[in-house]
Amino acid sequence: MDVLYSLAKTLKDARARIVEGTLYTNVADIVQQVNQVINSINGSTFQTGGIGNLPVRNWTFDFGTLGTTLLNLDANYVENARTTIDHFIDFVDSVCVDEIVRESQRNGIAPQSDSLRQLSNAKYKRINYDNESEYIENWNLQNRRQRTGYLLHKPNILPYNNSFTLTRSQPAHDNVCGTIWLNNGSEIEIAGFDSECALNAPGNIQEFEHVVPMRRVLNNATVSLLPYAPRWMQRAVIPTADGLNTWLFNPIILRPNNVQVEFLLNGQVITNYQARYGTLAARNFDSIRISFQLVRPPNMTPGVAALFPQAAPFPNHATVGLTLKIESASCESVLSDANEPYLSIVTGLRQEYAIPVGPVFPAGMNWTELLNNYSASREDNLQRIFTAASIRSMIIK
C-alpha cells in the first residue's frame, strides 16, 4: 500500500507540474522521481480485475526515462511525458479498484489483490516513499496491530434508528406519553411528549431519558447541544407499535427543563453537563445518556390553558426536545464522515461492477447494518479499502 500511495503521489505531482513552457530546472526533482518509478517497474507484468463484471486487464511496462533539457519544456517533451504518466495513472487506478472490490475474513488489512501483493515485492522498495497521508499512516499502524487514530468531522458513528416508546398509552392513542427520536450519523434528535402536559405527573414534572450506545469509542469530541428538535416540532401521522394502525402526533412546543447529558465509557460517567447548551467537549465515551424534563407551566394565559385542558379529550401533545450533534472527534477505528467521499466511492464501484456479496460486508455496503455489527474483520477490510479509495481519489481529481 505504501508503494501504491507513493506512485499515486508522484504521478499526481508530475501531471500537475510537467506542463509546456515550464523551466526544466523547476521540475527536475519530479522528473527524477518519475524516472525512478519507470526504472523500478519496467519489465514487470501485472493483472487486475476478474471479479464480478470488473474486466481482466494485463499490464506491461517498457518505457524510456524522461530526458533532461537546459530549456523550457516544449510540446513534444510534455506529450511524451504525459503518455508515460497517463499509463501509470491508469495502472494505479486499476489496482485501487481491484483492491476496493475485494474482501477477506482473515487479515483483511493486508492486500487482497494479486497486483497490490506484487507491488509489495522488495524490487519496488526503491520507489520514493511519501507517507504523509493519514490513511497510509494508520494503515501501517493497523498492519502492525498498533493504535491508530482518525480525525473525523461529523463522524457517521450512529446507526439509523427512528422510533418511539410510550410510557402511557390508550387503545385510541388519545392520551399518550413517551419519547420519539431519530439517531443517524453524528446526530441525535429526541423529543419527550405528554398529552396531559404532566397534569398527573409527580409535581407536574414528566421525566424523560434517552440512552444511545455507540459501536466505537470517540475521543476529544466537540459536541453541540440545542434545546429543540425541529424534526419533531410538526404534526405527524405515526404508526402504532404493532404497525396495524396510526395515530396523530400534534406537538405544542415547550422548553425542556433540567437537561443533563452524560458521556459514558464502559458504563462509567466520564463527562457530565447540566443545563448547558451550545458547544460542549467530551474526552472519551462509547455511549451518551440524555435526560430532561417537561414541566407543566404553573401559570397559563387562557390561550395556553386551552391547549392543555384539565381533563380529556387531550387534542395536543406538550413536547420538549433536544438536538445533539457530534461535530468532530478522533477515533481509533475508520469511519465515514462528512469530509471524505470514500464510502460513496467504495459503494459506487462495487455496484458498478456487480461485485457479489462476500463474507465481510453487507449487501450494498449498507452503513447502518455494517455499524450494527462492526466486527474486527469489517474494520480491517474497511480500513484497507478506504485507504485504496483515498489513493484513487488523488489521481482521478
UniProtKB/Swiss-Prot annotation:
Tell me the residue numbers annotated for binding Zn(2+). Answer: H153
**GO BP terms in the entry:** fusion of virus membrane with host plasma membrane
List locations, semicolon-separated. Virion
Arranged from A to Z, the UniProt key words for this protein are: Calcium, Capsid protein, Intermediate capsid protein, Metal-binding, Ubl conjugation, Virion, Zinc
Q: Name one GO molecular function term.
A: metal ion binding
Has keyword Ribosomal protein? Answer: no
Indicate whether Secreted appears among the record's keywords: no
Top-rank taxon of the source lineage equals: Viruses
The UniProt PTM text for this protein says: The N-terminus is blocked.
- Please give the residue ranges the record annotates as the region Interaction with the inner capsid protein VP2: 62-73
Spell out the GO cellular component terms annotated for this protein, sorted alphabetically and separated by semicolons: viral envelope; viral intermediate capsid
This molecule's function is given as:
Intermediate capsid protein that self assembles to form an icosahedral capsid with a T=13 symmetry, which consists of 230 trimers of VP6, with channels at each of its five-fold vertices. This capsid constitutes the middle concentric layer of the viral mature particle. The innermost VP2 capsid and the intermediate VP6 capsid remain intact following cell entry to protect the dsRNA from degradation and to prevent unfavorable antiviral responses in the host cell during all the replication cycle of the virus.
What more does the record tell us?
A: The VP6 trimer contains a zinc ion located at the center of the molecule. The zinc ion is not essential for either trimerization or transcription activity of the DLP. Zinc-depleted VP6 has an increased sensitivity to proteases.
> What family classification does the UniProt entry report for this protein?
Belongs to the rotavirus VP6 family.
Describe its assembly: Homotrimer. Interacts with the inner capsid protein VP2. Interacts with the outer capsid glycoprotein VP7. Interacts with the outer capsid protein VP5*.
This protein is called Intermediate capsid protein VP6
